[in-house]
Amino acid sequence: ENVYSTDYGWGLFKDDEKGGSGKASATKYKRTYTWNESNQLVSSVDDNYSTAYIYGQDGQRSNKYTANSETLYFNKMWTHHTDSGNSVYGGQSAKNIYLGETRIVTKLNSGTNPTYQEEYYKQYYYHSDHLGSASLISDYKGDEYQRIEYTPYGETWVEKTSNTGLEWLPYKFTAKELDEETGLYYYGA
């Protein structure tokens, strides 16, 4: 009788969880994706998010927009996220350091003039499995920050994050970015 939808925890709810009647409508959980002629995702719309994606001439994602935020992708080594709300992620830049094609460190900082301490304390080291997936992420001291296990097709099976930080680290299965709004991985293909 009840209709449920799951999107790996990205906010699709059953009516009565939000104070509604308890009678669920199948169309309430609808998400619409739109692709361009190059088969690139250009928009995703549901009850919680309306997200637009823009790509550069090289075919790689250059911008992601929602009603409250914007993410700029300068290259695989640097992204910048702005948020008009009171989110802890607003004004956050991520610098990625690679060894060959393998991401080994992400350094996070906020604002236009980050302090040395902020850059030092907000660096996260990736310990990857045979697919390149982040299975263990450690902090600047080498302590476990996040542990992730996956099903064979990339769904997060177990995720344990230390309660000492609030950083959203999107690089997960096969070292690709997990899009928070859709629950899809961006492979850049």
Task: Name each model-derived stretch.
Residues 1-4, 8-23, 29, 35-43, ...:
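A short glycine-rich beta-turn/N-cap micro-motif
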Residues 8-12, 111-188:
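A motif-centric feature for acidic-aromatic and gly/ser/thr-rich catalytic loops and repeats
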Residues 17, 103-118:
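Short glycine/proline-rich turn/loop motifs
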Residues 26-28, 46-48, 67-69, 91, ...:
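Glycine-centered tight beta-turn/hairpin loop motif at sheet-sheet or coil-to-beta transitions
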Residues 59, 68-69, 84-86, 142, ...:
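Detector for glycine-centered tight turns/loop "hinges" at secondary-structure junctions
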Residues 89-92, 100:
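C-terminal, low-complexity/hydrophilic appendages and adjacent surface loops
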Residues 93-97, 124:
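Short, surface-exposed beta-strand/loop micro-motifs that present aromatic residues
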